[in-house]
Amino acid sequence: MASPFAETTIEQAVQNLLNEYADCLDNDRLEEWPEHFIEDGCYFVQPRENIDAGLDGGYWMYHTSKAMLRDRVTSLRHINTYNKYYCRHLITNVKVVQQDDENFEANSNFLLVQVNFEGKIDSI
């Protein structure tokens, strides 16, 4: 059995990446956010209910390139301005679950809390 500490360096790097990613979003550095992705990287948000039901698709958001992520930032800055809010991402339990010479897969848990300018709180 491999040591549970064998992946610590990679897990710390993943944790640092996720922290920086969240910091961009939480501190209104939206223009920096797409730089956490490769040019043809995918970003999608799928409702947990769809995953639990075994449904493929039904995404809230589905972006397939860094250019689409930049478009999302433009939309947030200039179009979707009706409901301004502050957000905080809390990320825990980062774990590398699979690794080879060139790639790895990591899982984590997160909680997103949004507070709008009127004081309404949503946790996602």
Regions found by a protein language model. Give the residues of each.
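Short, intrinsically disordered, charge-balanced linker/junction segments flanking boundaries
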Residues: 118-124
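Beta-strand elements of well-folded, non-transmembrane domains
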Residues: 110-116
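A solvent-exposed, acidic/Ser-Thr-rich amphipathic alpha-helical stretch
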Residues: 39-109
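Residue-identity detector for glutamine
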Residues: 12-15, 46, 98-99, 114
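Short secondary-structure boundary micro-motifs
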Residues: 5-8, 18, 43-45, 78-82, ...
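Short, low-complexity N-terminal intrinsically disordered segments enriched in polar/charged residues
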Residues: 1-31, 35-39
